[in-house]
């Protein structure tokens, strides 16, 4: 990742800490991966605190594929089958079947309905019958071990939520440009500045976790 673009957001470790602060303050975070991977920026929000306004922003400026990142334990708790048995996508993204809250929604498409679905999936004691399938929210199963196992936005989201003190569940959506093309780092950074979001890279998070795990050992 071009460090010059990111310099105004501090050092890699400072960027992670600022991202955690943003999440705790109820703000979003822009998570960038490497130029040689997807080369995309994802808007992420804690599943516990995401507002209807934030969901509307995500739908308006994102790809439209609003995803709920969850752990394998939560996937099993909700009895959500993986979308396919043989995942042949380029990066092995762990989509499950799509979901909708069983109660409290209309068509499931609106920002409010999608927030209701997210809350239904992550609440304490959530059970399979709390969700209908299919729906308009796309759960993503994160790999155990987070970004140290797989350097994806899904794992980064779970790691950031955990480090910030939230349940291991977060909402993400890829940022797109107004013409429908994918936003790259310069556009993602500009958007984050306009919407008071912190910016962090997956590379930053890997280094941060590695350093803290070395200290712990």
UniProtKB/Swiss-Prot annotation:
<feature type="binding site">
    <location>
        <position position="174"/>
    </location>
    <ligand>
        <name>D-ribulose 5-phosphate</name>
    </ligand>
</feature>
<dbReference type="Pfam" id="PF00926">
    <property type="entry name" value="DHBP_synthase"/>
</dbReference>
<dbReference type="GO" id="GO:0000287">
    <property type="term" value="F:magnesium ion binding"/>
</dbReference>
<feature type="site" description="Essential for catalytic activity">
    <location>
        <position position="136"/>
    </location>
</feature>
<keyword id="KW-0686">Riboflavin biosynthesis</keyword>
<keyword id="KW-0464">Manganese</keyword>
<dbReference type="InterPro" id="IPR000422">
    <property type="entry name" value="DHBP_synthase_RibB"/>
</dbReference>
<keyword id="KW-0456">Lyase</keyword>
<comment type="function">
    <text>Catalyzes the conversion of D-ribulose 5-phosphate to formate and 3,4-dihydroxy-2-butanone 4-phosphate.</text>
</comment>
<dbReference type="GO" id="GO:0008686">
    <property type="term" value="F:3,4-dihydroxy-2-butanone-4-phosphate synthase activity"/>
</dbReference>
<comment type="subunit">
    <text>Homodimer.</text>
</comment>
<protein>
    <recommendedName>
        <fullName>3,4-dihydroxy-2-butanone 4-phosphate synthase</fullName>
        <ecNumber>4.1.99.12</ecNumber>
    </recommendedName>
</protein>
<comment type="pathway">
    <text>Cofactor biosynthesis; riboflavin biosynthesis; 2-hydroxy-3-oxobutyl phosphate from D-ribulose 5-phosphate: step 1/1.</text>
</comment>
<keyword id="KW-0460">Magnesium</keyword>
<feature type="site" description="Essential for catalytic activity">
    <location>
        <position position="174"/>
    </location>
</feature>
<dbReference type="GO" id="GO:0005829">
    <property type="term" value="C:cytosol"/>
</dbReference>
<dbReference type="GO" id="GO:0030145">
    <property type="term" value="F:manganese ion binding"/>
</dbReference>
<dbReference type="InterPro" id="IPR017945">
    <property type="entry name" value="DHBP_synth_RibB-like_a/b_dom"/>
</dbReference>
<feature type="binding site">
    <location>
        <position position="42"/>
    </location>
    <ligand>
        <name>D-ribulose 5-phosphate</name>
    </ligand>
</feature>
<feature type="binding site">
    <location>
        <position position="38"/>
    </location>
    <ligand>
        <name>Mg(2+) 2</name>
    </ligand>
</feature>
<feature type="binding site">
    <location>
        <begin position="150"/>
        <end position="154"/>
    </location>
    <ligand>
        <name>D-ribulose 5-phosphate</name>
    </ligand>
</feature>
<feature type="binding site">
    <location>
        <position position="153"/>
    </location>
    <ligand>
        <name>Mg(2+) 2</name>
    </ligand>
</feature>
<comment type="similarity">
    <text>Belongs to the DHBP synthase family.</text>
</comment>
<feature type="binding site">
    <location>
        <position position="38"/>
    </location>
    <ligand>
        <name>Mg(2+) 1</name>
    </ligand>
</feature>
<dbReference type="GO" id="GO:0009231">
    <property type="term" value="P:riboflavin biosynthetic process"/>
</dbReference>
<keyword id="KW-0479">Metal-binding</keyword>
<feature type="binding site">
    <location>
        <begin position="37"/>
        <end position="38"/>
    </location>
    <ligand>
        <name>D-ribulose 5-phosphate</name>
    </ligand>
</feature>
């Amino acid at each position: 990742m071009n460090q010059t673009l990111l310099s105004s957001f501090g050092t890699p470790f400072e960027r992670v800490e600022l991202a955690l602060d943003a999440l705790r303050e109820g703000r979003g975070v822009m998570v960038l991966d490497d130029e040689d991977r997807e080369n995309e920026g994802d808007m992420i929000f804690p599943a516990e605190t995401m507002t209807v306004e934030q969901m509307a922003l995500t739908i308006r400026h994102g790809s439209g594929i609003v995803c709920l990142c969850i752990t394998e334990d939560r996937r099993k708790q909700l009895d959500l089958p993986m979308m396919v048995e043989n995942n042949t996508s380029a990066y092995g993204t762990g989509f499950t079947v799509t979901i909708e809250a069983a109660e409290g929604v209309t068509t499931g498409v609106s920002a409010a309905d999608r927030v209701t679905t997210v809350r239904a999936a992550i609440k304490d004691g959530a059970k399979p019958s709390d969700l209908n399938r299919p729906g308009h929210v796309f759960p993503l199963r994160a790999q155990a071990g987070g970004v140290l196992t797989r350097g994806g936005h899904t794992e980064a989201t779970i790691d950031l939520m955990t480090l910030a003190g939230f349940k291991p569940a977060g909402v993400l959506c890829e940022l797109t440009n107004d013409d429908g093309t994918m936003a790259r780092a310069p556009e993602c950074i500009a958007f984050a500045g306009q919407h008071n979001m912190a910016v962090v890279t997956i590379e930053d998070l890997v280094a941060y976790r590695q350093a803290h795990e070395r200290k712990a050992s």
